[in-house]
A protein has these predicted regions:
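Nudix hydrolase/Nudix homology domain
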Residues: 44, 114-172
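A generic structural micro-feature
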Residues: 18-19, 96-102, 122-127
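Active-site-adjacent beta-strand/loop module that shapes the phosphate/pyrophosphate-binding cleft
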Residues: 87-117, 131
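Hydrophobic pocket-lining residues within nucleotide cofactor-binding pockets
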Residues: 52, 85, 110, 135-138
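A short coil-to-beta-strand element that immediately follows conserved catalytic motifs
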Residues: 73-83
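Short, solvent-exposed loop/turn segments at secondary-structure junctions
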Residues: 18, 44-45, 87-90
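Acidic, metal-coordinating catalytic segment for phosphate/diphosphate chemistry
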Residues: 1-25
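Conserved Nudix-box catalytic region and its N-terminal flanking loop in Nudix hydrolases
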Residues: 29-69, 73
Length: 172
C-alpha cells in the first residue's frame, strides 16, 4: 500500500515507551459526497474506521469498524487499497511516551441500507452520526472550528486525505 504522507510532530522522546495502535478507515463516495462520522459534541469529521485488533487484517478491521461506527455494511468485493498515513507524536497519556499509528484507507462500496450503530461509550458521548458530506465542508470544519479536547493531528490527517482524494479526481 502506498504511503500518502507522514505526520511527525517531533515532540516526543524516542527513549520513552512506544504505544502502537494501527487503524483502518473506509472511504465511501456517493454523488460527490463522502461518508464521514460527525462528532456532534465536538463538531469534527472523521472517516469511519478504527483500531485493528490482534490477528485481524486491515480490511476486516475496516469492515467491522465501519459497521459499528456508521451502520454501513461494506461490500467486500469492492474494497480497493487507497493508501496509508504514518503518524508519530507524543502520547496523550504520558509525556515520557510516544504514539505510533499507521492509518490504512480503503475505497469501497456499501450496501444501500443503513443499520444501527454499535458505539463505544466515548463515541456515544460524542454523538457520532453518519453524514454524507461535501469534502470541502469537512476540511473547513476540521481546520477552523474549535473541537474542545480533540487531538488536532487526527483532524488534520483526515483533512489532508480528503484533499488528496479531491486532487486525484475522486469527487468529479
Amino acid at each position: 500500500m502506498r504511503l500518502l504522507f507522514e505526520i511527525d510532530t517531533k515532540d516526543y522522546d524516542l527513549n520513552g515507551v512506544a504505544f502502537i495502535r494501527h487503524s483502518a478507515r473506509c472511504i465511501n463516495i456517493k454523488n460527490g459526497l463522502v461518508a464521514m462520522v460527525h462528532s456532534v459534541k465536538y463538531d469534527y469529521y472523521k472517516f469511519p474506521g478504527g483500531g485493528i485488533e490482534e490477528n485481524e487484517s486491515e480490511e476486516h478491521a475496516m469492515i467491522r469498524e465501519t459497521q459499528e461506527e456508521a451502520g454501513l455494511v461494506v461490500i467486500p468485493e469492492s474494497i480497493i487499497e487507497y493508501g496509508y498515513v504514518h503518524r508519530i507524536q507524543k502520547s496523550d497519556h504520558d509525556d515520557a511516551d510516544y504514539f505510533v499509528q499507521d492509518n490504512y484507507y480503503f475505497l469501497c462500496d456499501v450496501e444501500e441500507a443503513i443499520y444501527s450503530q454499535d458505539l463505544d461509550d466515548y463515541e456515544a458521548d460524542e454523538k457520532f452520526t453518519l453524514e454524507y458530506v461535501e469534502p470541502d465542508k469537512a476540511i473547513f470544519v476540521n481546520r477552523n472550528v474549535h473541537h474542545g479536547p480533540k487531538e488536532q493531528t487526527m483532524l488534520e490527517r483526515e483533512a489532508r486525505v480528503l484533499e488528496l482524494l479531491k486532487e486525484e479526481g475522486y469527487f468529479t
